[in-house]
């Protein structure tokens, strides 16, 4: 009788353990699915925000470029115009990064590619930050 009791209790313990392991696996898979869904949502929101910022920045740059086109330009204005055009091209290349990277990296070795992207980052960020600063400064002057 004691042996049957021990076997029955052992069987119950083993089945309870198997069920808890199965539940743990299910909860882990459900958690993974939820994490993936939330990451997709975050990426979607980030892409929408980035798209909106790019659109607004392109519009501001086009407006700024049109003001330089309509008036007489000095050498400094011409240089600013060239930088704005470069920024516009870089922003357009963000829409199609594979094609832009393919065009720019043909025939370069890895070190030249790394230097190219570093220069490109500087070329994008410098004028963009300067332009945004100038626009905000102009707005503050007009408001004040």
From Swiss-Prot:
Its main location: secreted. It holds the Pfam family Bombinin. It is found in: Secreted. GO terms for biological process: defense response to bacterium; defense response to fungus; killing of cells of another organism. Transmembrane segments: none annotated. Expressed by the skin glands. The modification Asparagine amide is found at residue 70. Keywords: Amidation, Amphibian defense peptide, Antibiotic, Antimicrobial, Cleavage on pair of basic residues, Cytolysis, Fungicide, Hemolysis, Secreted, Signal. The keyword Cell inner membrane does not apply. Residues 19-43, 74-123 form a propeptide. One of its GO terms (cellular component) is extracellular region. Residues 1-18 form the signal peptide. The modification Leucine amide is found at residue 143. Belongs to the bombinin family. Maximin-7 shows antimicrobial activity against bacteria and against the fungus C.albicans. It has little hemolytic activity. This is Maximins 7/H13.
């Amino acid at each position: 009788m004691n042996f049957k009791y021990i076997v029955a209790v052992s069987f119950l313990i083993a089945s309870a353990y198997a069920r808890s392991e199965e539940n743990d696996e299910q909860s882990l898979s459900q958690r993974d699915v939820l994490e993936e869904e939330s990451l997709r949502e975050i990426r979607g929101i980030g892409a929408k925000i980035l798209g909106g910022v790019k659109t607004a920045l392109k519009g501001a740059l086009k407006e700024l470029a049109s003001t330089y086109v309509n008036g007489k330009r000095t050498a400094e204005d011409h240089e600013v115009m060239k930088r704005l055009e470069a920024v516009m091209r870089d922003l357009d290349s963000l829409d199609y990064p594979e094609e832009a990277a393919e065009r720019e990296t043909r025939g370069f070795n890895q070190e030249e590619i790394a230097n190219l992207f570093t220069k490109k980052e500087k070329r994008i960020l410098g004028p963009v930050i300067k332009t945004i600063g100038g626009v905000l400064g102009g707005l503050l002057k007009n408001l004040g």
